[in-house]
Regions:
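C-terminal non-catalytic scaffold/interaction domains in large multidomain proteins
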Residues: 1-193
Length: 193
């Protein structure tokens, strides 16, 4: 595919693939483009940070940060697969981390690996660029909004910031993980160090 295309070119490629009632609304196409691409003089291209190699490196960095912060908080990190980690014993985890590079969360929400009450301790870690798309999807889909209500979402940038706090403790962790919501600007004050 052409790395730089106009919105009209993109739409002319997308719409024939999803005919009739499957045709995505222009607002969805715009939300996806805003999430993955940038426009320069009307030409859209994939953002550098969204190249497969960059996202792979981000996921590696997030796994390392989860392990490091967990160790500093006194928790042992268990990696159950590339995108699923826990702090503490996986049978009774203190926190559950799901790493994603997209805004696709339905399969995570349906997963029954952990008890339903574990959702309050479940964190979906995603790139900041996906936050707007996820917020858009939650606004448009009441079922998705309801299913994800008890989950916490942390952007990669917030985990990086928390990793830089030299004397992080469990209270600081808990206070800060909600400080950069998926919709809108960060709430409150991010801790300075």
């Amino acid at each position: 595919h052409n790395p730089k295309q106009t919105l009209l070119q993109i739409e002319s490629e997308i719409y024939p693939q999803f005919p009739g009632l499957l045709t995505p609304q222009k607002s969805l196409v715009a939300a996806i483009l805003d999430s993955y691409a940038h426009s320069d003089e009307g030409l859209w291209s994939l953002r550098e940070e969204d190249s497969p190699s960059a996202r792979h490196a981000d996921l590696d960095e997030m796994r390392a940060l989860i392990t490091d912060i967990g160790m500093r908080l006194g928790y042992e990190t268990k990696q159950l697969n590339d995108k699923l980690l826990t702090w503490g014993d996986p049978s009774e985890p203190i926190y559950i981390f799901r790493l994603i590079a997209s805004a696709l969360i339905r399969e995570i929400l349906k997963d029954k690996t952990f008890a339903r009450d574990a959702h309050e301790r479940s964190i979906i870690l995603l790139p900041g660029g996906r936050a707007g798309l996820l917020a858009y999807k939650q606004k448009r889909d009441p079922a998705l909004r309801t299913a994800s209500r008890d989950w916490r979402f942390i952007k990669f940038r917030l985990l990086r910031t928390l990793g830089e706090i030299p004397l992080i403790n469990a209270q600081t962790w808990e206070e800060q993980i909600g400080s950069d919501p998926i919709e809108g600007p960060p709430s409150g004050q991010l801790m300075m160090f």
